Regions:
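Polyanion-binding surfaces on beta-sheet-dominated domains and ring/shell assemblies
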Residues: 45, 51, 57-58, 73, ...
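A glycine-rich, hydrophobic loop/mini-helix early in the fold
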Residues: 7-58
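Catalytic-site beta-strand/loop segments enriched in glycine and acidic/polar residues
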Residues: 51-84, 88-90
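A charged, well-structured terminal subsegment
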Residues: 124-144
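Flexible, glycine/charged-enriched surface loops at secondary-structure junctions
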Residues: 160-166
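Two-metal-ion RNase H-like nuclease active-site motif
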Residues: 1-4
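A contiguous pocket-lining binding segment that forms or flanks enzyme active sites
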Residues: 77-123
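Single conserved hydrophobic/aromatic residue that forms the stacking wall/gate
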Residues: 168-176
């Protein structure tokens, strides 16, 4: 999802990949007027409509959705990845570059090092270093998923950063 500076427009993109090859099967984008003001922790109400439109337009059978957002590692333990996963009734996970809640122990700088994100003693996600000596990304379950599988899949997806790059490029193309 990308917002157009100075305009009330949101651009959303969807990339469907074949697993495990990560071959691009479909790409789609949409631009819509923003109908909900930004409220921290309620991104689904701002970003959900264009994303739902994209999912409804695809003819592909989707087995899992990876959102650039949060699932359980959210102040309400129900971030965009959880919310849209439930609405679509498709397994989902959230992967973000920003930790919203909780904390984790010090991590090794080694690629694929990981530490649980704890909130009040409960594991709500996993901090995962996707590249050596870089800041970690944060993985959490959304809907009908488990953390072990979510982390394993994310490690496979971030080998070349391709999935996020494809989708971000598509969002920028939609803006043009």
């Amino acid at each position: 999802v990308k917002f157009e500076a100075g305009k009330n427009i949101i651009h959303a993109a969807l990339t469907i990949l074949k697993y495990p090859s990560l071959e691009v099967v479909e790409q789609n984008g949409i631009s819509q007027e923003i109908t909900f003001d930004y409220i921290s922790g309620l991104l689904t109400f701002r970003e959900g409509a264009p994303l739902m439109s994209l999912f409804r337009r695809t003819s592909q059978n989707i087995d899992l959705i990876v959102f650039h957002s949060h699932g359980q590692s959210h102040p309400r333990k129900f971030g965009l990845a959880s919310h849209l996963g439930v609405l679509l009734d498709v397994p989902s996970i959230g992967v973000s570059n920003k930790m919203l809640v909780g904390s984790h122990d010090h991590m090794s700088q080694q690629k694929y090092s990981e530490k649980p994100i704890l909130l009040n003693g409960e594991t709500v996600g996993m901090a995962l270093r996707s590249k050596e000596n870089k800041k970690p990304i944060y993985v959490s379950t959304g809907h009908r998923s488990d953390l072990t599988s979510a982390v394993k899949l994310t490690k496979h997806l971030v080998k070349n950063y391709r999935p996020v790059s494809y989708t971000h490029l598509r969002a920028h193309e939609t803006e043009s």
